[in-house]
Amino acid sequence: MANSTGKAPPDERRKGLAFLDELRQFHHSRGSPFKKIPAVGGKELDLHGLYTRVTTLGGFAKVSEKNQWGEIVEEFNFPRSCSNAAFALKQYYLRYLEKYEKVHHFGEDDDEVPPGNPKPQLPIGAIPSSYNYQQHSVSDYLRQSYGLSMDFNSPNDYNKLVLSLLSGLPNEVDFAINVCTLLSNESKHVMQLEKDPKIITLLLANAGVFDDTLGSFSTVFGEEWKEKTDRDFVKFWKDIVDDNEVRDLISDRNKSHEGTSGEWIWESLFHPPRKLGINDIEGQRVLQIAVILRNLSFEEGNVKLLAANRTCLRFLLLSAHSHFISLRQLGLDTLGNIAAELLLDPVDFKTTHLMFHTVTKCLMSRDRFLKMRGMEILGNLCKAEDNGVLICEYVDQDSYREIICHLTLPDVLLVISTLEVLYMLTEMGDVACTKIAKVEKSIDMLVCLVSMDIQMFGPDALAAVKLIEHPSSSHQMLSEIRPQAIEQVQTQTHVASAPASRAVVAQHVAPPPGIVEIDSEKFACQWLNAHFEVNPDCSVSRAEMYSEYLSTCSKLARGGILTSTGFYKCLRTVFPNHTVKRVEDSSSNGQAHIHVVGVKRRAIPLPIQMYYQQQPVSTSVVRVDSVPDVSPAPSPAGIPHGSQTIGNHFQRTPVANQSSNLTATQMSFPVQGVHTVAQTVSRIPQNPSPHTHQQQNAPVTVIQSKAPIPCEVVKATVIQNSIPQTGVPVSIAVGGGPPQSSVVQNHSTGPQPVTVVNSQTLLHHPSVIPQQSPLHTVVPGQIPSGTPVTVIQQAVPQSHMFGRVQNIPACTSTVSQGQQLITTSPQPVQTSSQQTSAGSQSQDTVIIAPPQYVTTSASNIVSATSVQNFQVATGQMVTIAGVPSPQASRVGFQNIAPKPLPSQQVSSTVVQQPIQQPQQPTQQSVVIVSQPAQQGQTYAPAIHQIVLANPAALPAGQTVQLTGQPNITPSSSPSPVPATNNQVPTAMSSSSTPQSQGPPPTVSQMLSVKRQQQQQHSPAPPPQQVQVQVQQPQQVQMQVQPQQSNAGVGQPASGESSLIKQLLLPKRGPSTPGGKLILPAPQIPPPNNARAPSPQVVYQVASNQAAGFGVQGQTPAQQLLVGQQNVQLVPSAMPPSGGVQTVPISNLQILPGPLISNSPATIFQGTSGNQVTITVVPNTSFAPATVSQGNATQLIAPAGITMSGTQTGVGLPVQTLPATQASPAGQSSCTTATPPFKGDKIICQKEEEAKEATGLHVHERKIEVMENPSCRRGATNTSNGDTKENEMHVGSLLNGRKYSDSSLPPSNSGKIQSETNQCSLISNGPSLELGENGASGKQNSEQIDMQDIKSDLRKPLVNGICDFDKGDGSHLSKNIPNHKTSNHVGNGEISPMEPQGTLDITQQDTAKGDQLERISNGPVLTLGGSSVSSIQEASNAATQQFSGTDLLNGPLASSLNSDVPQQRPSVVVSPHSTTSVIQGHQIIAVPDSGSKVSHSPALSSDVRSTNGTAECKTVKRPAEDTDRETVAGIPNKVGVRIVTISDPNNAGCSATMVAVPAGADPSTVAKVAIESAVQQKQQHPPTYVQNVVPQNTPMPPSPAVQVQGQPNSSQPSPFSGSSQPGDPMRKPGQNFMCLWQSCKKWFQTPSQVFYHAATEHGGKDVYPGQCLWEGCEPFQRQRFSFITHLQDKHCSKDALLAGLKQDEPGQAGSQKSSTKQPTVGGTSSTPRAQKAIVNHPSAALMALRRGSRNLVFRDFTDEKEGPITKHIRLTAALILKNIGKYSECGRRLLKRHENNLSVLAISNMEASSTLAKCLYELNFTVQSKEQEKDSEMLQ
């Protein structure tokens, strides 16, 4: 097959041969086969080249038409003298290639008549030249009719092999063996032995191995052929097998065994050994057969046949014992493969005996390969259960010992093989497990392997290992499968058609279960219909159509692709009227193309359905369409069934701008639940009738279950009520919860559509909100099972446009399970309350999402003049106040409580009172969401409130917000409202007279709203007057949120901007306490400027004399700027001795300050008179600013401060509470419970969850780690050291301090109830956990404690250093345990800044006797680095002073550490100003970033009182931000702390680990503490220590630095002892010293210091009972608590370095301060007696949990476990589990390692669950045996 160019290259030749084969097959199928290729000039004609050439010129027809055959002839081998060469070439092409071209190139149908009836006029070459044997076949029917035999011998290819092997002809045998070798290779056509099992026997016979039965081939092959072929296989086996036991398997029938042994000796003497190799004919033949058997042993179907063939087993045993290396390797490999299917005969059979002999010999060998193969064979033998008895009996103890010895070798493959066989052996039962356990140190080695890392084997350990990962179908991404919705385009709504998903999927992934690919023909027809349409004037190239189809199929990785013939059939089906024409293409040398006429390409392809749903049963679509008066055709979003089971995909049904009298919203979200699928498609046409004035509402009650819903389908019902004067409450119970009915009457006029979308998946909201439709996104918070969520959307008057929502782009966010996250993109939302014509319609959309995941695309709130905007986050209800309507609107909100009693639903009543008439177009609205006190509630509900005021202006008397008490209906209600336990209808008239409405409501919890940013300078708000109406206890809440302009600050990145990121993790346990709010200011790193966060001021007034107070802007040119998050202005008056009486506010003015910039010289101006001016500095990178102060008390503080007091008579007690709980004074008991909220906090079981859920990094927010998720009754334990106490509960004191909410009974404030008739508690606001213990007012002395404000002093201290978040300053209180804001007082230490009068209820006598209420270390401590806090007590802002209150005498200075970046703003303290005045004293706190608080016990002498000035030294944070990421992988289950104490000198030897699970009683955990570490301390590093903080250990409070115009009167500091100079034995490189009392030893690393201190000073026998570290508070601690404290406070790198720096100056300062002890106020100079500190019950767990973030559990937690490490650990754990399950001896040995295994069982290792099962086996088996013994004794 040569052409004119000479010899073809190999590729061309290969292609030519393939073409000829295909051509022959084509002609054969048509009945016109050819055998010879035509020859031209003595050479074969290159048909492939001819076909290629002709087709490139356009095909046969085109070449003939242009008469180009003469040109083609020149390229082939026609003689030059041949005149008819062109004609001959054309005939050859016509005979061989024309039909092939027609079918394969042009894709036309083969219209040839089948060859059964050939036409005589065909050319001679078309007549079939082969004989038709089919004419002789007799049908089965005829055979049966005539009695012919029906039993046919169907010959197959295997019969040919068998016959070839049987023939004995060398030629045939070689051919058959070669074929078997090829077939045995892993390929598409694997040899199937079951088709003819005789092949195995014949192959073995050709290798000289025969069966012992009579029918064997030994006679033929062994004797007769040996003479003819000169091949003696018997001699071959005898030569290569030396083991006498195995030699008996050699079949030698000629000689008796008695005489052979002697002859063998002489043969070995006189004959040289066999030279094995290529020249050894027998050896090569045996090797060939061994290769075939080995290859076959990898196929499951062949393994059973090979294992059942005893001759094959004999051959393998002979091969395994031969000294022919290649043969031995092949034999052992094959034995290992078939051993799993090998059923051993009884041991008296020789093969069984030899099998164990082979295994033992391999195990005892010194050859690594033999050892591994022996273990593999033994392990696979264990897989057959019938072999268990034999294996347990005949595998001796020496073999077990040899196997276990392999574990000590640093060889990965050997260790893996050993673990595999040990695991298989332990599955056999108690005999094997006991034998393993009896091997010395076997259990110890296995326990060590559980925590082994692959790095222990060295860097070259993986060189010999090749990892082949098989991706499982469960891990395949489903994101690429996007079923497309086929929208129904409606002309009325003008919805443009847009495919919802991509037409081409980039990556092929298997569809999820239940999704089946549609068949090829249907897909091709859909594809044609989607891409082409009928057009009689157009044509499309048919080849291009097919090529595009092939391209689409390849991109989609479709399985079935139609051939061109099938494709053209589909083309005729889709376009039956098309025609075909030939079109000349001038660009390709005049080549003609076949075009399809009458078909045109679509401009926009239609969507294609690629999959269909097999299980459409579980889906339900609820569509409620209510069309009042005028009913246009609804436009449902058609969604194929396939979309309802695909998670994380959404259907985008665009909603265009409707006409003026039609508003429609379409949303469709495919939802994937846990077990069910809910699909909600809602479309609600708006009532276009302008003349109808209807009173209606559309309440929707959705009762959800937080647990997975196995059966029910989650449904969302959309109700559009068009019937006048009817309320339509709808209850949908999902998950079995009892539906709670909600009856609400709405008096606004106009229809109100409500769209409720309920889903359990991530909702992506695209830009689907029409411009005239405000979007109210209401996401229910943590909803326990059966808790109703009621959302009532108030209708708006028809004549007023409610607002617009513009430009809401899609925003995608990934949220972990159980967390809500609402992110917004920074597009403006403008909600205008302007008036429109009566014909305008409004529409609100309420989206109710379940507590799984929600991503709501809303936008930043940008306010201009007369703009009202609000957005509501999780669990919040929204009511718009100020919308004018003829009647007072009344809306009841049934909010969410965590599993309350069925009859006690938390209710939140928001009363709307429009004050101005609709004719006032400039009226502004205030959105207030509050929550009332709950009556008879078991614990504080998880209710969060949003208080959003109009940022631009607040007209006088605009907003009235009241929180009512259940079962109270106000007298001024315009219409009767049913009052139930669940709903509190409350109405307010526009008058300012107070109304009697029950007990005081709770202090409002504010949900920080995303900072509002403006691109332009907005005009300053006009003077605004807010009138607040007061209820019976005169408790009124008014929250104003001014809008600040952010001039010059660009929009931040939209990916980081968020409205509200809130996380309410589901807590475990039946009595889940109230959740906390996350109030993060979104962390957006601005490029070069600081952004202005959203200010918020909370004014809380308790007054029965004045009905309101004024908030007036001073000048229009200024704007009220109040801090980042939450600022509560609490001017607190001294409560009189009588009942509930407070002083009115005369004129409380908010001074609008100028816009705060980053410049350090920002000036804040104060006003004169009795005014309190708050100016909050929200900037991120503030230098210490210069503050010019006016006459007034001026507080310049970042967001989150509590300022108490202006003057007597102007003060506003936050909440005046009557004494409760049967107080002797007889006050009425108040059962209101305040939800124990801290504003800016997260409660979660794991910090990683919080980080992942909120999308924030570690430095972006506080995360409060919930330690004991299942607390009793409402006592919420947090790791922050705050006890949240509820009504009727005197909360136990956590770490010496209480969290007293403002509605707490005074019995919790540290005073005796008898002496406290009334306690004025000051709450610092929800975003801070400052001095929540508040001011404990004493009735007799009329004194109020100093309110010590410590915004960041209560944060968990990590490594003993308080350091701030490295962030943008948008958040104040960050509470992540290993945070830079962490200064933790929960480990048994009490915060020295604590007012000691509120420390403990047991302090009543002391507090009553000497009334010594002290503020430790001064009243002001600022930790934040970006603000200057200045408090000047003016004459009218007096600091209350009584005999026991001590204030700072001078400025409290914080020296700024230069090496720490500036951090977030902190808070400043304002003393109460009631009685006496300290003139001219200024307290300036210059916060430093990451600075160590002066009271931290981690440093030796932090606070030195020198001339009345307290200095705060700064310490660098031990772990920088870069280090924080490395701590994230610590094995941390929920609520578990794992502590590691490892010896740094020999790191790999042992580690001391302890873990305390969440929910465990600390006293119980302490009993399980392991003492082995102390016992083994002398020999090697301690193994495992369990650190538990004691539950109730009395601890003395911290010393207080008192500066009150007198010398400092503080008790001797524990760090006042002189610190000796460093150890003279210090060696080079030793930079860290143990600062333990009189130790002074030097070490190289902090870990060495920690190990030394934990073992030498914290040992069981030497621990003195308290920490004697220099500068540490002398608190009594249990030893396990001390170890945690030691690691947290003292043994970090920075803490040690700081201790060294402050060692010498610390001595002088502490001694100096300790010598100053004059009297204070005439009291004696003796130090105050230490008070006992009552630890919270969960203090131990929280202390353990808190430090877990700092541990570097590097052995197996830093990096993710590799596959080999995971395999080794998991296999070792499985072995231990089996040993613990079956072996009594093993259990006894495992008991010693129970503590170690307990730690590992709660880690994040892959083997942790297996280890937990192992521990269960240890305990359960013992208990079950004890029970069996007891039952036997009873019988």
From Swiss-Prot:
Residues 1513-1522 have a biased composition (Basic and acidic residues). GO terms for cellular component: chromatin; kinetochore; nuclear matrix; nucleoplasm; nucleus; plasma membrane; RSC-type complex; SWI/SNF complex. The keyword Transcription regulation applies. Highly expressed in heart. Its main location: nucleus. InterPro entries: ARID_dom, ARID_dom_sf, ARM-type_fold, Chromatin_Remodeling_Comp, DNA-bd_RFX, WH-like_DNA-bd_sf, WH_DNA-bd_sf, Znf_C2H2_type. GO terms for biological process: cardiac muscle cell proliferation; chromatin remodeling; coronary artery morphogenesis; embryonic organ development; heart morphogenesis; homeostatic process; negative regulation of cell migration; negative regulation of cell population proliferation. Keywords: Acetylation, Chromatin regulator, Disease variant, DNA-binding, Intellectual disability, Isopeptide bond, Metal-binding, Nucleus, Phosphoprotein, Transcription, Transcription regulation, Ubl conjugation, Zinc, Zinc-finger. Gene3D superfamilies: ARID DNA-binding domain, Winged helix-like DNA-binding domain superfamily/Winged helix DNA-binding domain. Component of the SWI/SNF-B (PBAF) chromatin remodeling complex, at least composed of SMARCA4/BRG1, SMARCB1/BAF47/SNF5, ACTL6A/BAF53A or ACTL6B/BAF53B, SMARCE1/BAF57, SMARCD1/BAF60A, SMARCD2/BAF60B, perhaps SMARCD3/BAF60C, SMARCC1/BAF155, SMARCC2/BAF170, PBRM1/BAF180, ARID2/BAF200 and actin. Interacts with SRF. Forms complexes with SRF and SRF cofactors MYOCD, NKX2-5 and SRFBP1. Involved in transcriptional activation and repression of select genes by chromatin remodeling (alteration of DNA-nucleosome topology). Required for the stability of the SWI/SNF chromatin remodeling complex SWI/SNF-B (PBAF). May be involved in targeting the complex to different genes. May be involved in regulating transcriptional activation of cardiac genes. This is AT-rich interactive domain-containing protein 2. It comes from Homo sapiens (Human).
